[in-house]
Amino acid sequence: MMNYRTSIYVVLSLVIFLNVQRSFVAESSAKRKVHIVYLGEKQHDDPEFVTESHHRMLWSLLGSKEDANDSMVYSYRHGFSGFAAKLTESQAKKIADLPDVVHVIPDSFYKLATTRTWDYLGLSAANPKSLLHETNMGEQIIIGVIDTGVWPESEVFNDSGFGPVPSHWKGGCETGENFNSSNCNKKLIGAKYFINGFLAENESFNSTNSLDFISPRDLDGHGTHVSTIAGGSFVPNISYKGLAGGTVRGGAPRAHIAMYKACWYLDDDDTTTCSSADILKAMDEAMHDGVDVLSISLGSSVPLYGETDIRDGITTGAFHAVLKGITVVCSGGNSGPDSLTVTNTAPWIITVAATTLDRSFATPLTLGNNKVILGQAMYTGPGLGFTSLVYPENPGNSNESFSGTCEELLFNSNRTMEGKVVLCFTTSPYGGAVLSAARYVKRAGGLGVIIARHPGYAIQPCLDDFPCVAVDWELGTDILLYTRSSGSPVVKIQPSKTLVGQPVGTKVATFSSRGPNSIAPAILKPDIAAPGVSILAATTNTTFSDQGFIMLSGTSMAAPAISGVAALLKALHRDWSPAAIRSAIVTTAWKTDPFGEQIFAEGSPPKLADPFDYGGGLVNPEKSANPGLVYDMGLEDYVLYMCSVGYNETSISQLIGKTTVCSNPKPSVLDFNLPSITIPNLKDEVTITRTVTNVGPLNSVYRVTVEPPLGFQVTVTPETLVFNSTTKKVYFKVKVSTTHKTNTGYYFGSLTWSDSLHNVTIPLSVRTQILQNYYDEN
């Protein structure tokens, strides 16, 4: 029998419940939007039970089972607990007040961020002792890709010679428009699609008339392209119209691919977009299916959200994936060269910057004075003999308007450009300026265009058989001076040729987003760099391509290169954690290119690359297989990190599924065991702790070498680390002090542990801040 206090509680609960029901019913006609209700770590292993609990929560608040079913978009039930549902703003606020709910936030959208890459990085298929052969090219490793889908007919998904599907694979091949289970094989072992979040936010979307396929099939080509880079099979004799010829393959060519399509083409806007709700569901399914590596070439824009904020769906999903042993690799973004633009900055994600290759597409321009200038283009049409060259400008005796600015060529009269090669200048950072200039000139009857622009922006294919050649402003000015000084200037354009090797330097791409990390300045981002400029890989047969292959540029292309390397490392070291894999990649990276030359960062002006451009450096796959020491981390480290940056204990507890109490005083974020040290606000001195784990020879002795940042003193204690059968982990302290007396920018150095076989290097990035939290505009 109930006592008086219990009876009162029941009555009050019923009253509150009925009032909530009534208010929810009254709001049913209000505008509903997709909201993600994040509940943290799942409390039950049975996914059906988890989903039922989600429906019960919605049912109790919406008033009926039918309304709950209509509202539900997704149930996240494998890697973590939560759901996406269509709710009014008021309904979302009420659900957010429930004690089991960590966050409720509106759905958000993400945007999409080879033949030479692997030979350039030293990952040779011809060397029988290489990492490729030591790991049997990634066999039995599953790379999950979240993107625009897959074109299964491409030869890069050929499963010839493949053994059985890995026993830990639990996924499947989902059917849909122009896609059925027969499109999967032993290479492409899984394909699923997630569209509910996209549909809920785009009610006018007409799936019948849409160009996109309502299935795992790729329309855009982006998903097929990045899958090729990560794990595509060998396809010989591939080129782009005769350029960049060779064998296309992925980093782990015998790894298995699972595609999770979460990005969709919106016909009305002519854009491809990815709902956070769909991405989270794709990650949830990938965790269930058994992927070993997740490759995500998507990103949001700054300002960023914190790591426990569900608004960054990739960060939240990645946290749960990493705790399950899945390495998550993400693109760093294409908003460079400005600082503070890098995205996907969570400390459990490997964030990737993009570099050029040692390859260019030289296009000879011969002026009438016999001077030869090597421009850049992807022009494979017939050579153009000596032809009149013009820079549209007012000669001083005309009332007509002339412009040599590329964007304004359309305002020139046709007779200005007809039958000529046109020189123009642009300050635009975008490849579209090149294409637009070519269109204007061709429309006017011109025969070619030379575009002078800032160096560093990726060369793109132009109009078919129409020469559009890029030069920098310096060379463009040389051509302009010749044009002005000659009575009858002419130019000859020859087809482009592929140059490979030492004459072509490696650079961090202009578009590659830069650090420092805007959300957590003590966490170095990006982590690592990989080639991402003019990468030749497979695409769909619905896109402009050659032989079903196309060249694309972006950190989207760099991230899957690291995913391929991570797959090889996982195949070689099955017991390594995602943090150990990241450490091995970062600490063994090249600080120079493979030929020993300095790596520059493109921009205005170009400069020597530093950790905010490329993290630890340019990935060195062979060295990463045997790093000697690793900076490892697990759940306890991530909890200490979240405590150190001020996240509340309740959020952390729900995130990890168990009670968390942060220490008082709270730990220092500088002690987070990253393979880097970044100090954003040093006033006088600080001492930092790191722990390294020996993964090399059992009995090893390492000695430290420090290259201190300019104006800083760095002391390491102890200076020697000794490992044996009983000592596999050792911690050391790093004391950093500044001699600067004013607020400074960042200075860079490095710390290296060396034995006779290994050099384990981490970057140091330090800024003096005598006056804290101060913005200086002077």
Swiss-Prot record:
It comes from the Eukaryota. Its main location: secreted. GO terms for cellular component: cytosol; extracellular region. Residues 388-483 form the PA domain. The active site is at D147, H222, S556. It is an enzyme of class 3 (hydrolase). Keywords: Autocatalytic cleavage, Glycoprotein, Hydrolase, Protease, Secreted, Serine protease, Signal, Zymogen. Belongs to the peptidase S8 family. This is Subtilisin-like protease SBT3.6. It comes from Arabidopsis thaliana. The gene is SBT3.6.
